[in-house]
Amino acid sequence: MAIYHLRATMISRSAGRSATAAAAYRSASHIEDHRTGLSFDYRARSGVDHVEILAPAQAPEWAQDRAALWNAVEAAETRKNSQVAREIRVALPAELDHGQRVELVRDFCQRQFVDRGMVADIALHAPGREGDDRNHHAHILLTTREIAAEG
């Protein structure tokens, strides 16, 4: 039986964090931050089972591109103490297979966030090589604002 764990945090500039760095790390990808000029490359990272972006139907096509999405979010927030994204980390039942875990997270994100106008950047992580082999979990990065057709 899975043990419930959900943690919600904000990604804010005042804490020295950025949405581009968080998205690159959680998805094991490479993102160049246009605001700072920094490059975040985590493509060599292992343990990421599934990545996906869910966006409202009216969202522009570029919202499906991780680098474009999070750079647009960073550009839209101009204050030095801006909260640029919300992150949710949730434990997933080890009793489910991979496909069932993906569907569970998709359904949760669609109902709770995407249907309310937010974009959800999903990354499912496998348990680490050392430690509890039941530690399947998801990282969900969310826009803090609704996204419209014009962005």
Predicted regions and their residues:
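N-terminal nicking endonuclease/strand-transfer module with a His-rich metal-binding environment
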Residues: M1-G151
